[in-house]
Amino acid sequence: MLCRTNVLHLRPQLNKFTYLTQFLWLCLFYITFYFVLYSVLVFTNTEWPFILLKKRLVSQEKIRAYQSNDCVGQTRGLTSEPSWRDACWRALILAYLTSIYFFPILGSFPRVLKDQVDFGYIPTVCILLYVIFLFFFDSYRKSLFTTALTHSFWL
C-alpha cells in the first residue's frame, strides 16, 4: 500500500524553463494572431464601415485641396493645406461616426467583460487627446521644423 507522500512525490513538477517556454509560445501565438488579423483587415478587399468612412473623408479632403489650387482659389488666398481647426472638426466627426460602430461591437463581448470594464469613456478620451495634439502640435509644426533645420539638430 502506497502512502500519500509517495504519490505526491511521483507527480512531475514544472520548472521555470517550462513556464518560460509556455510564455514564449503564448507570445508567438498572440503576435501571429494579430498579424493575420491585421493582414486580413488591411490587405484584403474587405471594407469595414470605419475604413469606408475614413476613405471618404480623405477623398473629400483631396478634392477640396485640388479645387483650392486652381486659379480662382489662388486669387482668394486659399491654400491646399487645411488648418488645424478643420483637422479637429474632421477628427471629431470621424470619432463620433466610428463610435456608432464601436458600441455594437462591444455588445458582442461576453457578459463578464462588459460587467467588469466600462468602455463608454474611451471615444471621448480619444477625441480630446487628438484635438489637444492637433492644437499644440500642428500649429507649431512648421516653426519647429525650420528651427531644427537652422540649428542643425539633425547632426
Curated annotation (Swiss-Prot):
Pfam families: YMF19 (PF02326). One of its GO terms (biological process) is ATP biosynthetic process. Keywords: ATP synthesis, Membrane, Mitochondrion, Transmembrane, Transmembrane helix. It is a multi-pass membrane protein. It is found in: Mitochondrion membrane. GO terms for cellular component: mitochondrial membrane. The chain crosses the membrane at residues 23-43, 89-109, 117-137. Belongs to the ATPase protein YMF19 family. This is Putative ATP synthase protein YMF19-like protein. The gene is YMF18.
